[in-house]
Design a protein with these regions (language model features):
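Conserved alpha/beta-hydrolase
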Residues: 55-74
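Conserved acidic catalytic loop of the alpha/beta-hydrolase fold
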Residues: 85-102
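Conserved loop-alpha-helix segment in the C-terminal half of the alpha/beta-hydrolase fold
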Residues: 207-232
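Short beta-strand/loop motif that positions the catalytic acidic residue
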Residues: 197, 203-205
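Short beta-strand element of the alpha/beta-hydrolase
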Residues: 31-38
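Flexible "cap/lid" loop of the alpha/beta hydrolase fold
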Residues: 113-124, 128-155
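The serine-hydrolase catalytic nucleophile loop
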Residues: 40-52
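Catalytic active-site module of serine/aspartate enzymes centered on a nucleophile-bearing elbow/loop
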Residues: 231-252
Length: 252
């Protein structure tokens, strides 16, 4: 298990429940922490963050997957491969493949949406962090999700809000069809389900970040949650020392 600060770690692969290859990196030893990336992104987004560096320095084992449809993982072109919480099932399978009995999960942005659903399905998660997220994802008809799902559909008419996302996705050679299906079938976790979570959860967000709703409302919906507000906007807060400090303190 190599340790690499600020550079992309070596990718490994496992075959998920439906035959899709899922890429991941696995660095360090100690208590396992899974980092779950956001939309139009992949696991390498964590490489330049303070939190990944400090987790490794403090002796944690850091596991970083590329969610299906992203990065080096499989990008199937049929819609059926993105339904029924497929991404969550991939992560459950990865944890089993790596023989993790208890572990920690840190999600950011859309990664927090995936992590929230995972929390409701897997008792092996000891602690978790939901970063850059409010309560809006609990609505199955969330207009922001639908807006971006439609934007990534073939031949879609773009709005001022979605033009930038499409341009960025093209610039990083992301798979537009996969991104469409990922948004269309994004997991939904109800407020009731959040209220049933028994493990400890940290909600952390930048003070300029309301892109996905009010993070304090998410904190209030999860009984055993803590809340940390740090400086920063949605795209920058998770890279900062303040984000890392909040998480490292929570994990002690």
């Amino acid at each position: 298990m190599q340790i690499s600060f600020g550079v992309q770690a070596q990718k490994e692969f496992f075959t998920s429940f439906d035959g899709i290859e899922i890429a991941y990196s696995d660095e360090g030893k100690g208590k396992a922490v899974v980092l779950v990336h956001g939309f139009i992104n992949n696991g390498s987004s964590w490489d330049a963050t303070v939190v990944k560096k400090e987790l490794l320095q403090k002796g944690y084992r850091v596991i970083v997957p590329d969610l299906r449809g992203n990065g080096s993982s499989g990008k199937p072109q049929e819609e059926k491969f993105y339904t029924d919480d497929a991404e969550v099932r991939d992560l459950q399978g990865l944890a089993s493949y790596l023989k993790l009995k208890k572990f920690i999960v840190v999600g950011y942005s859309r990664g927090s949406i995936i992590t929230a659903k995972w929390l409701t399905l897997d008792g092996r998660i000891k602690k978790s962090v939901l970063g850059g997220m409010g309560l809006d994802f609990t609505n199955p008809e969330w207009n922001r999700r639908i807006l971006f799902a439609n934007a990534f559909a073939e031949g879609a008419e773009l709005t001022e809000e979605t033009k930038g996302a499409i341009a960025y996705a093209i610039s990083v050679q992301a798979d537009l069809k996969a991104l469409h299906y990922l948004q269309k079938h994004q997991p939904v976790t109800s407020v009731f389900e959040l209220g049933q979570i028994k493990s400890k959860v940290l909600i952390v967000a930048g003070d300029e970040d309301l892109e996905n709703g009010n993070p304090e409302a998410l904190h209030k919906a999860i009984p055993k949650s803590a809340f940390a507000l740090i400086k920063g906007n949605h795209n920058e807060a998770y890279k900062t020392a303040s984000f890392s400090k909040a998480i490292i303190s929570f994990l002690k």
